[in-house]
Amino acid sequence: MHHMELTHPHSGLRSIEPHRIDTTPVRRHEHRVQSVSSDYQRLRRLDHLVVGEDDASTIVTFVCRWTGVPVPRLKFHARRSPFTAATERPRDRVVAESLALGLAISSEVSVLAPEGAIRLGRSVTLMTLSHELGHHLVHHVDPFDTPAHGNVWVGRFDQAAAVVAGLLSA
């Protein structure tokens, strides 16, 4: 896994103010994350902290600029839970993967954001946000055949979570 430098000043960043929730669902990939994560307890702490659209946008922009990847298009949906989200691959990534696999390129590729996208609820837990940022980092840094919820992704999830947690203490 390619390691990214994670040291950056917080100067000029406005304060992130999450609110706390007490209960969270069991996650689908919980066992893998728990067994591979370098700081599973940090992830669990982030799962109890919720932010709205403005803070989520600020966090995503900061993490992406810090790690040197493009900022994804953010799509907020009122009906999406704070615990669920989805990441769309960048358009060029889909085209490159299709070409490498000898597949026809779908006409639907043209609607994909060039930088990728993340779909979130109007409020989102910081663990969910870190989870999706982990996918976004994989899409921009790692080979296209990197498993969606494999060990490399858990490492990117941890990297994003470390930056997010650092913002809270800034």
Language model segments and positions:
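Active-site-proximal or metal-binding-adjacent scaffold patches in catalytic folds
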Residues: 1-127, 136-170
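Walker B catalytic acidic pair
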Residues: 132
